[in-house]
Structure formats: structure tokens, C-alpha cells
Amino acid sequence: MTADGLGCEANADAAYGWYEKALAVFHAAEEEKPWKYTEYRIGKMVAAGLGTEQDYLQAADWLTLSANEKYKYAQYSLGGLYYHGKGVEQNHEIAFALYTRSADQSFPYANFELGKMLRDGIGCEKNSVEADRRFKEAFLGFVFLEEKGHDDKLQYRLGWMLLNGVGTEMNETKAKEYFEKAATVGNPFACYQLAKLILSDEKIQPQEVEKALGYLRKAVEAENPYAAYFLGKLYEKGEHVPKNISEAVRLYTLSAEWDNDFAAYRLGKLYLGGEGVLKDVEAAIRWLTFAADRKNPFAEYALGILYLKGEDVPKNVSKALEYLKRSAAQGNQFAQYRLGKVYLMGEDVQKDITAALQFLTAAAEQGNQYAQYTLGKLYLMEKDIPKDKEAAVRWFTLSAAQGNVYAQFFLDHIDEFKDPSVLLAGTRLLHHMSRVFADNAPPLKPPGQRADRKLLRKLREKKQAQGHARDDYEQTMSL
């Protein structure tokens, strides 16, 4: 209560003192008579650094003692340490086993973690049926616990599951009710989600807008990075509030300082483009690097293009390729397309048709119309690879279906290009339109995907949590 300011003013020093006393009591009780509960409590406090220095290694030892006595709470907590590799060597299989032992004793939090692991195939084989069963058990368990204790964290979790249809039928109305309960006592995550729900209503009334903005500001005061980022986006775009880039930058900075890589990416973009702020390449690089270090694929792509072009920073092809490959490995179709073009043209690196085809195909299969168009030309021209008219038609068709008029041109005249020289003449006629395929092309919704689905889903969930639309790629093909 002293730490959280419940019933009194928050006082971290006083709270530490109380935790220290509590820890001493647990140690004394354990010395007198070893007990799984005290071992668990000591392990949790040491892991969190409550009343003592944080020490995951020591925490793992205490939790292991308790878990070996089949204490479900310790099994769950120890499973988390193994999952994240804190105090122990990371081992998803052991984490899965510990979560299973805990879940089999009807602990809903363990069931929830098992659901995620089974869904993603982490530490086990993918099993969507079993994942759904575990999620349903988790949901029912959370409902039971919430009815007994009316905990705001449980209310938020239940709202999230109802909103996303995890372990239960999707029900936005019920989700909103849970968020409202949690927001009443100031739960920052609930405040944030509730604000997003309110603002998503196309027929929203002015008084509701003010209510939503109030929830967002309340969440920002509680240092919620997602709320700060979302509110920053509203100010940047001038949605529901007067456009104010300075306020957007302030909120993005707060969010980034609270470790939000998307906010850091936006800051990098703003400072690099001088969009409403004084252009500051040094600050842009600093924030983009901050985001890239946290595996943000858009920041990795942005840095890759920067170092490849060498306009605002000294050209560094090696660095550029490193960042582009990191971004491409996370399924960024724009990075895949750019790498394909780099290896195809052989201007900054040794020409590598095999690598070019690999990256272009990866981008094309995600629906990148420029990669599809490029592949169509490659298969038709018979210059770097054997001619494959069927493949050319397939890629041109996919590109044209997205409105690519140049792909449509080739489809309309496909039989006229029997002689490569005629084809070359045709492409020269279209040369003045080639800027459409330059790096400033806007992203389009992909009809399919090839990249690692687990990586893409994690990124998508992370973006949606921060208020992005499902098909919002948060970037164009250039900076």
C-alpha cells in the first residue's frame, strides 16, 4: 500500500523498509521450519527486489525448493524464469513442463501461458486445439478469481481476452465493462484500452472524446508507454485534438524513455524529416538505433536505407545490408524488396541473382507489388534467369491486381515480347514512369505472407496494443 499509494501517499523508501521487515520474518520462519509457502514468498521478493537486492539466481533457488514440493504458484513463477532465462539457463521445454504442473492444479495464469506456448509451438509442438482448451480454462479461472477479489489487474486481463476473443467469444461490450471497472481504480492499461475503444466509435460524441482523452492522460501520468505513444499519434495527426507536433514529440519522448521502440521509431522519422520539428540527423539516428536495438523492423529498415543512400549520413553499405537483413528476417517486405533490388543490380554489392530471387520472392509472396512486377520482368526477359512465361504472367497478374499499370502493360503485350530487344524498347518507353517503383511507394495490404508467422504475429500484436490498425505498416518504402 505504501509503495502504490493506496490509502496513503506513495513512499518508496518507507515501502522498502516494510518489505525488508517482511522478508526478515519469512527468513526467520523458514529457518525455524522449512515450508513451501515461505520459500515461494522469499523467491518472489528476491526476484522482484523487494526489501533486498534483485537476484534472479537466488530467486530461482528458492522457487525451486517450493516447486519441488508441488506448490503451483512457485511452479508458475519458476516457469517464467526458465521461459525468459532469468537466473537459470533459458529452457522453454522446462518452462512448459512447470507451467503444465501448475495449470494441472487449476492455476489460470499457468493455463494462459500454456495456451500461448501451444499456439506458437514454443517448448512444445503447435496444437491449436489444446491451446484453445488452455485459454478457455484460463478465462474461466480468471472469472472465478475476479468474482472473489475484484482485482483491477484481473479485470483488465478479462477485458483483454473478451476484446480479442481469447479463451472466450469476442465481446466488445463485456470487455468495455471490465475495462471500466479497472479504470475506475486507475489501472493504466485499462484506461488506455478503454480510451481506444471509445475513440474507435465512428459516431463518437464530443463528451465521449473528452472522456477518452482523460483516460489516456491518466494512463500517461501512470507512465504507460502505450498511452503516451497513442496520445502522441493523435497530436501528430490532429485527430480528436488540435494538431501539435511539439506535444507529439514530448509524448513520443516519454514513451520511448519508457522503452517503447515504436515511439523511438516515430521520433527518428520526425527528426530525420524535419516534420514539424527542426531537422536533427544526430537525434534521428540515436532514436532509430534505440528502436533497432530492440528489434523494431521499421527502424532497422530506415537505418538500412539511410546508410545505403548515404545522403544524411556517410554511406556504409556493410551497415546498410546488416540492418536491411535484420528487418527482412522479421518479415519486412520493404526490406526484402530493397535487398532483392540491391543484389539484382549489383551496384553496391557483388551481383547475386540467387539472393536477389530469394528476397524478391519473399517480398512478392507477401503481396509487394513492386517485387511482383520485378519478378515478372526477370522471368520474361531471359537475361539473368531462364525464361518462364508462366511465372512471369503469374507475377504480373498479382501486381496488376493491386493497380500496377506497368504490370498490366506487360500482360497486355506479353506475346509481343518474343525478342528481348523489343522488350527492352518497351521498358525504355516506360522509363519515365519508373519513379513509381522508387522507394517512396506507399505500402499496400498484402494478400498473403511468407515470413515467419510467429514473428509477424508478435509484431502485429505489439502494434495493435499500441493502437495501430491491423494493416498499418507504420512506414512507407522510404523515410
Describe the predicted segments one by one.
Residues 1-4, 39-48, 77-84, 113-120, ...:
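Hydrophobic face of amphipathic alpha-helices that form TPR/SEL1-like repeat modules
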Residues 4-6, 25-27, 32-35, 39, ...:
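Short helix-capping/linker turns of helical repeat alpha-solenoids
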Residues 20, 131-140, 390-405, 409-419, ...:
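TPR/TPR-like (Sel1-like) alpha-helical repeat modules
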Residues 450, 457, 461, 465, ...:
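Non-Sec secretion/translocation targeting segments of pathogen effectors
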